C-alpha cells in the first residue's frame, strides 16, 4: 500500500512538472507570436485574430457536445483491448459528426456574425474560411482525447510542444507576406498543422478505423454525449458569469475597469494553469480508471490535492512578490491598479488546487447533473459576491469577491462529494494546505504593507519557507529527487565504465 502511494506521488509530481513545462513553452510561444503579430499587423490585426478565434471557440464549444472531455472518462474505463478498439472507433465517429455539425452551424451563423460580431463588409466567402477551422478543431480535440484516455501522456506532451512550434512556422510567414489578408489563411494553416500533429501520434497508437455498425456506435456514445453536454452547459454558465460581471462593471464603472478586471483575471489564471494543466490531461484519466473503487478514488483525490498544493504554493508566494514586475512585462504601468485584485486572486488559486480535484469526481463517476448542480450554485454565488465587492471597493473589491467565491466553491464541492460519493478528505491533506496557506497569506500582507529591502527580505524568507516545506514533503513521499540523482549517477558510472573498457 505504501509502495503504491509512493508510486502515485512520484507519478503526479512527474507529470505535473512535465505538463507544467509544456504549458510554459506554449505560453512562451504565444507571447512570441503575439509580439511578432503586434509588430506586423498592429492593433487591428490582433483585434481581428481575437474575433475570429472567439467565433471558432464559441461554435466549437457549443457543437462538440463535450466529447473531448467525456470520452476521456469512457476510454479510461476500458481495460480489455477489444473494448478499447471499439471505444476509440466510437470516439472518432462522434468527433466526425461534431465536426460536421460545427461546419454546418458555422455556415448558418454567417448572417448573425456579419451583423452583430464583425461587420457587414465581411463577405460570406471570407467567413467560410472559418468552416474548416471549426471542423479540424473538433477532429483534433477528439484525437487528443484518445491519447489522454489511453494515458499516453508522453505523446500528449510531445504533440503539444510540436504543435506550438509548428504553428509559429506556418502562420508567421503568412502574416509577414500578406499582412491582415493572411489572417484567415493562417488560421486554416494552424488548424491543419494541429490536426496533422495529433494524428501523427494517435494513428501510431490506433490506426484510423470507424465502427462497423453506425447505429450501435451512436447508441454506445449516448452516455458519453450526456456527460459531455453537461460539461458544455457548465462551461456556458461559467461564460455567462464572466459576461455578467464584465457587463456590470462596464455599466456601473468604466471600460478601463473592465480592462483592469480582464487583465487581472488572465494573469492569475494563466500563471496557475502551469500546474493545473495536468489535471485534465493526467489526473482525470487516472481518477476515471478507479471511479468504481471508493477507497482508491478517495486516495487518488487526496494525493492530487496534496501534490497540487505543495507544487503551487511556493510558486504563488514568488508570484505575489513579483507581481509589479510581471504586470510591467505582460502589460504596462497603466495596469498597476489591478494589483490589489490580482493579489486576492493569487490566494484564491491555492483554494482552486483543493477544489479542482474534487470537482472531477462527478465527471469521473459519470454523474453530470451533480457537476451541473454544484457549478450552478457556485456561479450564482460568484456573480453576487464579485458584483458586491466591486460595488463596495472597486477593482480590489472584485478580487476580494473572487476569493470569497473560491472559499464558497470549496465548501460546496466538499459537501457534494461527501454526500454523493462518501468522499473523506485526509487529515494529511488538510495539514498540508493549512501549513502552506500561512506563508502565502503572509506574503500578501508583505507585498501590501512593506516596501524596499524589507519587502524583499521577508518575501524571500517566506518563499524559502514554503519551498522547503514542499521539497521536504515531496521528497519524503515520492523520493523523486533521490531517484533522479541515482539515475544520473548510474549513467555517469556507466560512462566511466565504458571509457575504462576502451
Question: Where in this protein do the model-derived segments appear?
Answer:
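Transmembrane helical elements of multi-pass membrane transporters/channels
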Residues: 14-31, 163, 186-194, 198, ...
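Hydrophobic transmembrane helix module of multi-pass membrane transport proteins
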Residues: 93-243
Amino acid at each position: 500500500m505504501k509502495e503504491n502511494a509512493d508510486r502515485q506521488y512520484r507519478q503526479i509530481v512527474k507529470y505535473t512538472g512535465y505538463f507544467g513545462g509544456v504549458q510554459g513553452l506554449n505560453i512562451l510561444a504565444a507571447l512570441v507570436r503575439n509580439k511578432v503579430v503586434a509588430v506586423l499587423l498592429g492593433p487591428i490585426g490582433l483585434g481581428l485574430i481575437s474575433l475570429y478565434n472567439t467565433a471558432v471557440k464559441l461554435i466549437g464549444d457549443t457543437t462538440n457536445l463535450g466529447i473531448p472531455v467525456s470520452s476521456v472518462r469512457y476510454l479510461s474505463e476500458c481495460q480489455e483491448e477489444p473494448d478499447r478498439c471499439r471505444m476509440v472507433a466510437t470516439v472518432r465517429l462522434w468527433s466526425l459528426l461534431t465536426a460536421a455539425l460545427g461546419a454546418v452551424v458555422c455556415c448558418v451563423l454567417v448572417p448573425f456574425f456579419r451583423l452583430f460580431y464583425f461587420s457587414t463588409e465581411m463577405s460570406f466567402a471570407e467567413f467560410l474560411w472559418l468552416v474548416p477551422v471549426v471542423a479540424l478543431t473538433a477532429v483534433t480535440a477528439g484525437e487528443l482525447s484518445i491519447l489522454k484516455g489511453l494515458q499516453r501522456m508522453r505523446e500528449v506532451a510531445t504533440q503539444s510542444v510540436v504543435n506550438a512550434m509548428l504553428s509559429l512556422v506556418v502562420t508567421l510567414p503568412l502574416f509577414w507576406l500578406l499582412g491582415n489578408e493572411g489572417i484567415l489563411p493562417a488560421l486554416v494553416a494552424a488548424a491543419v498543422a494541429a490536426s496533422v500533429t495529433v494524428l501523427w501520434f494517435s494513428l501510431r497508437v490506433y490506426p484510423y478505423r470507424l465502427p462497423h455498425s453506425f447505429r450501435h456506435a451512436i447508441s454506445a456514445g449516448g452516455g458519453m454525449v450526456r456527460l459531455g453536454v453537461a460539461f458544455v452547459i457548465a462551461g456556458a454558465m461559467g461564460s455567462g458569469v464572466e459576461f455578467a460581471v464584465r457587463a456590470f462593471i462596464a455599466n456601473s464603472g468604466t471600460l478601463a475597469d473592465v480592462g483592469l478586471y480582464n487583465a487581472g483575471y488572465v494573469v492569475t489564471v494563466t500563471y496557475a494553469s502551469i500546474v493545473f494543466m495536468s489535471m485534465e490531461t493526467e489526473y482525470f484519466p487516472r481518477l476515471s480508471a478507479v471511479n468504481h473503487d471508493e477507497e482508491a478514488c478517495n486516495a487518488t483525490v487526496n494525493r492530487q490535492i496534496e501534490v497540487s498544493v505543495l507544487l503551487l504554493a511556493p510558486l504563488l508566494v514568488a508570484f505575489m512578490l513579483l507581481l509589479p514586475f510581471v504586470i510591467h512585462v505582460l502589460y504596462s504601468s497603466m495596469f498597476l491598479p489591478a494589483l490589489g485584485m490580482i493579489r486576492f486572486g493569487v490566494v484564491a488559486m491555492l483554494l482552486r488546487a483543493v477544489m479542482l480535484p474534487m470537482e472531477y469526481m462527478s465527471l469521473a463517476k459519470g454523474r453530470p447533473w451533480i457537476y451541473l448542480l454544484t457549478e450552478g450554485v457556485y456561479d450564482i454565488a460568484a456573480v453576487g459576491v464579485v458584483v458586491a465587492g466591486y460595488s463596495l471597493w472597486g477593482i480590489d473589491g472584485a478580487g476580494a469577491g473572487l476569493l470569497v467565491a473560491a472559499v464558497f466553491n470549496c465548501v460546496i464541492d466538499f459537501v457534494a462529494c461527501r454526500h454523493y460519493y462518501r468522499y473523506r478528505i485526509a487529515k494529511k491533506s488538510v495539514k498540508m494546505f493549512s501549513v502552506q496557506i500561512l506563508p502565502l497569506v503572509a506574503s500578501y500582507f508583505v507585498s501590501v504593507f512593506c516596501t524596499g529591502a524589507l519587502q524583499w527580505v521577508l518575501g524571500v524568507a517566506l518563499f524559502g519557507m514554503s519551498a522547503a516545506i514542499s521539497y521536504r514533503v515531496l521528497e519524503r513521499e515520492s523520493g523523486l529527487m533521490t531517484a533522479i540523482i541515482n539515475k544520473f549517477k548510474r549513467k555517469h558510472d556507466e560512462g566511466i565504465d565504458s571509457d575504462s573498457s576502451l
